[in-house]
Amino acid sequence: MKDKLIKAALSLAVVCGLGACTKNYLDINKNPYEVDKDQMEAKDYAIASGLSAMFGTVVSTDVNTAQFTDCLLGGTQGGYYADANNGWTNTISKYNPTDNWTNVFMYSDKVIPQLYSNMSNVEGISEDPLVMAILKIVKVCVLNRVTDTYGPIPYSEIGSTGKIQVAYDDQPEVYSQMFDELDEAIALLDENIDRSITSTTDQVFDGTAVKWCRFANSMKLRLAMRVVYTDFVSSKGLSPQQLGEQAVAHSVGVMQSNADNAQLSSLAFGKDGNPLYTACMYNSPAGSVTGGDSHAAADIICYMNGYEDPRREKYFSKAQFSGDNALEYVGMRRGIAIPALSTVGLLYSGVNFVDGMATPLQWMNAAEVAFLKAEAVGVFGWNMGGSAKTFYEQGVRLSFEQWGVAGVDEYLVGTTLPESYTDPNGGATSYSTQLSQLGVAWNDGASKEEMQERIIIQKWIANFHLGNEAWADFRRTGFPHLIPAMESAVGNNSQGIRNLTLGARRMSYPADEATNNPENYAKAVEMLGGSDNMATRMWWDCNPAVK
């Protein structure tokens, strides 16, 4: 190769010495292996486009997809949103959904196919280790939500097109692979920690390697806590405790401040804006100031009203009832016969988005990480580098800061309790049972169960809009206590659910899997260890106290 380059240089010298070089010298003599400015810009655009499409699969930027996955599923089962469209007779909240309500995570072309096809495209044009790390992290973020919805899922056998009619992986194996991919991403980021990619390529962290590394470690801590009640051992022989401690002890560590929050910029949205905002506003009656298809759930408002939580004005619009409930925060009960939206439903508090259509899509926040550390220390005795009280109060402070509200010092010493639910529309849907006996103020002498409940309640409030994460915590810990669906609304078509307090533990697989992928579907149900319905618990849902 060296001889060829020397000969090429000599030939060029001879040609130029014999006469003037051609005026098109720069074009004719361009190195065919060198990328010019136009090609580089095209490559950068292709990478940015692929990453943006992948980012849009974590919390989907497609409004219809996001409505099913994060409003009608996560939003309701997490106790944040209530279904308000009285045209819906079959809902997840009533445990009688149709297949097109529950198959979205696996069958929508806006989730797995969009993730894998764009991941394959980016891998084909970039060898940048930062980009490769981002691909791995985003893949874990997406498929974590999928496996936590169904249990065993296709993972290792999915190809570049995202086709899911392949063999399923058992859920422990899915988690093992997710931890491995996070570790691979962290290793790549470690080697390039002072580098960045073009900020316009990255609509989450502006191309900053350090922030992606903190996010990866934070995800690792989140997943370690998810499997805490299992006997899980990673491919490297690590227990959940060791995985969590490893994430926190890493040189870059986990999220520490709101500057570390993982959220997708509104620059990534299409004309419809924030998909959750648009989905909540669908079918708003004329003149409504509270929204349409989704309204605020009674569950979270009962807690926040009782705690006199100043974040309410950021989370909800005020109810439009008259009399004693005028201009107060009043949520709608989930799992009921939905009242007419145009006359009654529009009177309940709506779901608020601080910047409307331009509100960023939250993936994970520093407050959640602080609460993860508080639970790890207080309940399970992990070494997180501080006390449970310190991390608990840090989580509350971070959330108040994130939402831009004052009064955190007074809030942290509060002893008031969540209020019971009185429905202004009539007593039949009211709920008089006390949801919790705990105030906000920390108690060092509390039992581990009480510590866990207090931590999860505040984590739940801080994670508003992240309904799928709230639902996962509810299944894992039993907290917060939520208002159950009404027996009269659920009827007999309850997807195997007999205990309304426990609620839905998973979603059924897409109905077509039984015919389009029968052998692999049968094996998936066998790995699940129970019937393919909403009552069967998945592998990590094994806390003996939740029964």
Where are these regions (language model features)?
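Intrinsically disordered or highly flexible coil/loop and linker segments, enriched in small
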Residues: 14, 18, 63-64, 321, ...
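Extracellular glycan-recognition regions
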Residues: 24-26, 102, 480
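Beta-strand acidic-aromatic groove motif in beta-rich domains, primarily in extracellular
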Residues: 62-71, 152-153, 467-472
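Structured, solvent-exposed acidic/aromatic patches
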Residues: 81-407, 444-453, 458
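Bacterial Sec-dependent N-terminal signal peptides
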Residues: 1-30
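Short, compositionally biased low-complexity segments
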Residues: 22-32, 84-92, 148-157, 412-432
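C-terminal functional modules
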Residues: 400-547
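Membrane-proximal, proline-rich intrinsically disordered regions
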Residues: 21-79, 125, 492-547
